[in-house]
Amino acid sequence: MSNNSSTSFKNQKPVEPIGIIPRSIIRTFNRFIIQLFPNSNALVIQEFRISRYQVFVSIQCLLSLIFIPLIITFLSKTFVFLPLTEYVWNTQTDDIFLNSYLEKEALSELQDFEEQLYFDYFVSPNTYETPNWASYQISTDSSSQLESSFNNFPEILKSEIQKKTLELATHYNQKSIESLTNLFSDFVSFGTFALLVIILKPQIIILKSFLIESIYSLSDTIKSFLLILGTDLLVGFHSPRGWELFLEFVLNRFGFPHDENFIFLFVATLPVLLDTVFKYWIFRYLNKISPSTVATYHAMLE
């Protein structure tokens, strides 16, 4: 008896096909029919076990897809890529900057520091020896001006500039190493995620079914609210600034140059493409699956 029950449980599919009619309605109707039969208690228990198994597998799959790539990325970055990159970068190359953008950024920061020293030097004459006011020119955009003004500095200010230069060199050398390390570790993270998608394909099908069923169980108002919230965050009026910050974060993470033309082009085109995809999805699929949600969505927009 128990063997037949376990065999029947294993043969039962935890994923139901998706049709035009929401599965919540079909499931409610099936439960009503099942309760009309004498052995309805056993079937209800079996259905409960299937639902519990579906929830357990979905949570396990979701946590695996999130935390396994993060853990592997952290371990590979800390114990493999970072020491290896530091060794190769500091011993096999003479470069400090990964690209010219980081070099210009360091030079600009050094010039700002020099101008701050000029300001402090002029407003606090008692702190340093009396300056020769006619010999000072604030450097703005030239390394030669920086060098000539450096020669006019007192020794204490020269030491401050030298100290700041060493700090910037160390900082940007480490930043170049971290940029390369982030590139390698993120590539490993992406590969790990793709491998998990292939290995956990049955569990992902169950997870997808669980998420769709959970969304279907929501009311039309809540579904419309979530739809408006998602579209406004991605393609709304204030979304370009968010996309700009996201792109700057990606460029800083990998040490890529900040090309303003590329950033403006990205911000101007991607929200438009996403808005077109959302509208097509609402018209093509959501209008067939849940017309009431589409009606509520348009009513809330108006």
Swiss-Prot record:
Pfam families reported for this sequence: CemA
Function comment: Contributes to K(+)/H(+) antiport activity by supporting proton efflux to control proton extrusion and homeostasis in chloroplasts in a light-dependent manner to modulate photosynthesis. Prevents excessive induction of non-photochemical quenching (NPQ) under continuous-light conditions. Indirectly promotes efficient inorganic carbon uptake into chloroplasts.
Keyword Transmembrane helix: yes
Annotated transmembrane regions: 55-75, 187-207, 225-247, 262-282
GO term, biological process aspect, one: potassium ion transport
Gene Ontology MF terms in the entry: antiporter activity; proton transmembrane transporter activity
Keyword flag Metal-binding: no
Name of the protein described by the UniProt record: Potassium/proton antiporter CemA
InterPro entries reported for this sequence: CemA
PANTHER family named among the record's database cross-references: CHLOROPLAST ENVELOPE MEMBRANE PROTEIN, CHLOROPLAST ENVELOPE MEMBRANE PROTEIN-RELATED
Family: Belongs to the CemA family.
Organism ancestry: Eukaryota, Viridiplantae, Chlorophyta, Ulvophyceae, OUU clade
Catalytic reactions on record: K(+)(in) + H(+)(out) = K(+)(out) + H(+)(in)
UniProt keywords, alphabetically: Antiport, Chloroplast, Hydrogen ion transport, Ion transport, Membrane, Plastid, Plastid inner membrane, Potassium, Potassium transport, Transmembrane, Transmembrane helix, Transport
Membrane topology term: Multi-pass membrane protein
Compartments reported by the entry: Plastid, Chloroplast inner membrane
One CC-aspect GO term: chloroplast inner membrane
Superkingdom: Eukaryota
